[in-house]
Design a protein with these regions (language model features):
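Short glycine/serine/threonine-rich phosphate/pyrophosphate-binding segments
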Residues: 42-45, 67-70, 97-98, 122-127, ...
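Glycine/threonine-rich beta-strand-loop-alpha-helix active-site module
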Residues: 98-202
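An N-terminal, well-structured beta->alpha segment
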Residues: 1-87, 417-423
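Carboxylate- and glycine-rich phosphate/diphosphate-binding segment that chelates Mg2+/Mn2+
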Residues: 173-282
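N-terminal small/polar loop signature for handling phosphorylated ligands or for N-terminal nucleophile
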Residues: 66-138, 254-265
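C-terminal charged capping/lid subdomain of soluble metabolic enzymes
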Residues: 2-14, 329-423
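C-terminal catalytic subdomain
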Residues: 282-353, 357
Length: 423
């Protein structure tokens, strides 16, 4: 009985907190990055950097990006424009507080005055973390995690995404993992929004199909979670979600099957950007909260975990998301078959859910997360609860026990899926 009362009070507290946050969201000075887009757009970036009076750039990137030669055109243009630069490429797929500190040391030691974040979400998150620490030299990453704890201008970031998923080029969030604890948490502050985003589809042509799939599903997750949350959204965020989901519905499978299709690649970059801008205000939900805990604990790609969990969490929300998922079904002009011709919100929502599940299968993404260990379930729940409640305006609030039941259901699903494969 006491547990039930505690749960009810917790859920009421979350909704009161979110009502206050909604008022704050409406008063904040939201902005979007300026955009350079289209094939070859990256060549225009050095001129934009120079025209804004910057002289020495820290290029934050990943070792694989550098090895693949994706930086070459940018570096040639920078030399032509006589811009000095230093490259920092010591970043893992889940950036850590130690990597951020390494970047801070280079930025300050080399007397850089801006950054180009050239890579996927991990690179951009690391660049934002570097910026936050430069702005707040006396605060460790742990003390900057949460909402609005930077509150000072950071060095200007020019974001060049080489994947189409995180949307970090259009967000105020940076997800950083603590090396000692493996805890993965977000820094969220308006100061972290990049000033420029360069959407050049040519940079994504060489992505392996698996990466295209996982990052594309991550973008879908951002859009669907932001749309179904809705509490913090304005009409602008709803429009961004709608555009993102429609573009993903039209182009993700094409980009996966034919990576050289520049239109599909451009569509996916725009989808990731729109979804990123949408969840910046609209927020994410339990897919991300649970997914961050899992990917941080086991070191698996962020997009993979999001892709696996998305349909399961939406199904677990039940009737609380029928209307919103039905909207997305309509936005994508999906065909809905019913015997009597009556197409209810529940039927349209189910059509959208089935599309997500079928898309996962076509993209080669497992149905369940097979990396979860039973002894880690309580830790996953603890971290996810800490991240999500009371901030995320989810359609249905789960207490720790309800979330544990969901994670255990994922564990059992993975066991059954594994047993079927071994038969």
């Amino acid at each position: 009985m006491k547990a039930n009362v505690k749960s009810v009070l917790m859920k009421k507290y979350c909704r009161v907190y979110q009502a206050g946050a909604k008022l704050l969201m409406a008063a904040l000075p939201w902005r979007s990055p300026k955009m350079l887009s289209g094939s070859g757009a990256v060549k225009k970036l050095p001129e934009a950097v120079r025209d804004r009076g910057f002289h020495k750039v820290l290029i934050v990137t990943g070792p694989k990006i550098r090895a693949r030669g994706l930086l070459n055109e940018l570096l040639e243009e920078m030399k032509e424009k006589k811009l000095k630069y230093v490259i920092f490429d010591g970043i893992s797929q889940n950036p850590t507080d130690e990597e951020v500190e390494n970047g801070v040391g280079i930025f300050l030691g080399e007397k850089c005055d801006c950054m180009i974040a050239f890579g996927g979400g991990s690179v951009m998150d690391c660049a934002k973390g570097i910026g936050a620490r430069v702005a707040r030299p006396k605060k460790a990453i742990r003390n900057l995690q949460g909402l609005f704890r930077v509150l000072r201008p950071i060095p200007v970031i020019f974001a060049v995404p080489t994947t189409s998923g995180s949307g970090s080029e259009a967000t105020i969030a940076a997800v950083i993992t603590e090396v000692q604890t493996h805890h993965k948490a977000s820094i969220n502050d308006l100061q972290l929004m990049p000033r420029f985003a360069v959407l050049d589809p040519c940079l994504t042509v060489g992505l392996p199909p698996q990466v295209t799939a996982q990052t594309g599903m991550d973008a879908l997750c951002h859009a669907v979670e932001a749309y179904t949350n809705d509490t913090y959204n304005s009409d602008f965020e709803r429009l961004m979600c709608s555009k993102a989901v429609r573009l993903i519905h039209e182009s993700l499978l094409t980009a996966y099957e034919d990576g050289t299709n520049l239109q599909a690649r451009q569509d996916m970059q725009e989808a990731a950007f729109h979804a990123g801008r949408a969840f910046t205000r609209g927020s994410v939900g339990y897919v991300h909260a649970i997914g961050h805990a899992i990917s941080g604990l086991y070191g698996v790609p962020h997009g993979l975990v999001m892709a696996i969990l998305l349909p399961h969490v939406m199904r677990a929300y039940g009737s609380s998301v029928y209307d919103k998922l039905a909207d997305l079904c309509d936005i994508c002009a999906m065909e809905v078959d019913t015997p009597d011709g009556m197409i209810s919100a529940e039927v349209r929502a189910e059509t959208f859910l089935q599309w997500m599940e079928e898309l996962k299968e076509k993209l080669g993404i497992p149905k369940y997360p097979d990396m979860i260990r039973e002894e880690d379930v309580n830790q996953i729940v603890k971290w996810a609860q800490k991240e999500a409640n009371p901030v995320y305006p989810v359609p249905e609030i789960w207490d720790a026990q309800e979330m544990k039941e969901f994670v255990l259901a994922m564990l059992e699903g993975a066991r059954l899926e594994g047993a079927e494969k071994n038969e």
